């Protein structure tokens, strides 16, 4: 189910009056509800969230960290997930039936996740099985719908995050000769390349044309990349890197592996949001960095490291628009709905989908 389907089915819309409240009033009310509920309320926040939201997060992290935290939390009655829809789905699947997972704004989706739906995936699988036989194991980035995770779990595969993709790909190659990697071609390509797989041994599946694009024929294909991408990270270009180095040859460039292979290759380093944060934390004072990832995180890193010269690799970059739908008014409204006993934006993955999706998620967690 795409995020558009979710919106059509949902009446969980915040009243406009919340937008008229002062920031101080909203912060006071959020803090009061957090104090009232104590450990019965848990707020995980993704690194890409706004500061006005992240200040109230009980735990911040990337997709892998938040998935692991959600799985371990047994105390909270309500988990208010400050992230996007697929993350809240994952939290729902990893927590108990007695726990309620809430997304403050149901419009907080992920364009990448919507680039692979079940009809497209079933058609692709049928055609790829015809071409390659039973030699393929599917993997999906956690930035995917619960239905896609279920498909992958049903066919023996696992989910991956940008933190653990390399480990999961290594495991997958012990299971089958070939990998189908959904839905982000860039993370799949960059990870496979790091494992020593040549670009000519990778092919791209175009779901819009229902065709496989392989430069050197089908025989040597080891990785089949779904033609999807992150709309934020695709905006970092090789021109950004050339311009940055021309302006300052001493600057170090670190990017997220959702960037294109060309950008990753030209950069000094690449890794998950956690890896980027850890790298900057450990860097010496006075070091200079250009970071290729979402702007909210970059701005937060800049603020936290006044002793270093840090900037965005793309000076015209904007934050992730869907992630930014979770703002302070929506967080407050969501918490007050819980306080009234009428939680809105409840995320509930159907049992049949959940069972197969959990196979994929648990395989990932056991590998990493």
Curated annotation (Swiss-Prot):
Its cofactor is [4Fe-4S] cluster. Pfam families: NadA. Pathway: Cofactor biosynthesis; NAD(+) biosynthesis; quinolinate from iminoaspartate: step 1/1. Coiled coil: none annotated. It is found in: Cytoplasm. Binds 1 [4Fe-4S] cluster per subunit. Keywords: 4Fe-4S, Cytoplasm, Iron, Iron-sulfur, Metal-binding, Pyridine nucleotide biosynthesis, Transferase. Homotrimer. Belongs to the quinolinate synthase family. Type 3 subfamily. Catalyzes the condensation of iminoaspartate with dihydroxyacetone phosphate to form quinolinate. This is Quinolinate synthase. It comes from Bacillus subtilis (strain 168). The lineage of its organism: Bacteria, Bacillati, Bacillota, Bacilli, Bacillales. The gene is nadA.
């Amino acid at each position: 189910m795409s995020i558009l389907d979710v919106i059509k089915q949902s009446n969980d819309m915040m009243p406009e009056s919340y937008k008229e409240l002062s920031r101080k009033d909203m912060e006071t009310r959020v803090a009061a509800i957090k104090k009232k509920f104590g450990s019965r309320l848990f707020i995980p926040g993704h690194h890409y969230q706004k500061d006005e939201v992240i200040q109230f997060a009980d735990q911040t992290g990337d997709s892998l960290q938040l998935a692991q935290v959600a799985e371990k939390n047994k105390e909270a009655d309500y988990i208010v997930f400050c992230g996007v829809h697929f993350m809240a789905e994952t939290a729902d699947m990893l927590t108990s039936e007695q726990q309620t997972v809430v997304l403050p704004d149901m419009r907080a989706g992920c364009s990448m996740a919507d680039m692979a739906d079940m009809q497209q995936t079933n058609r692709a699988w049928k055609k790829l099985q015809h071409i390659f036989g039973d030699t393929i194991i599917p993997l999906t980035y956690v930035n995917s719908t619960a239905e896609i995770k279920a498909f992958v779990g049903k066919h023996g595969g696992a989910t991956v995050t940008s933190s653990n993709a390399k480990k999961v790909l290594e495991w997958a190659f012990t299971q089958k000769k070939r990998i189908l990697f959904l839905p982000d071609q860039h993370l799949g390509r960059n990870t496979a390349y790091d494992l020593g797989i040549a670009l000519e041994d990778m092919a791209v599946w175009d779901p819009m044309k229902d065709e496989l694009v392989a430069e050197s024929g089908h025989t040597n294909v080891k990785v089949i990349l779904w033609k999807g991408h992150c709309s934020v990270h695709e905006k970092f270009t090789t021109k950004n890197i050339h311009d940055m180095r021309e302006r300052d040859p001493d600057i170090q460039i670190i990017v997220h592996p959702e960037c294109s292979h060309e950008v990753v290759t030209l950069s000094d380093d690449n890794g998950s949001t956690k890896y980027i944060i850890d790298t900057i934390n450990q860097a010496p004072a006075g070091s200079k960095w250009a970071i290729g990832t979402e702007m909210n995180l970059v701005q937060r890193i800049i603020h936290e490291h006044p002793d270093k010269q840090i900037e965005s690799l793309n000076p015209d970059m904007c934050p992730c628009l869907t992630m930014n739908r979770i703002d302070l008014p929506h967080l407050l409204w969501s918490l007050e709905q819980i306080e009234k006993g009428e939680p809105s934006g409840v995320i509930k993955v159907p049992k049949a989908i959940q069972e197969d999706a959990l196979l994929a998620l648990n395989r990932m967690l056991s590998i990493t």
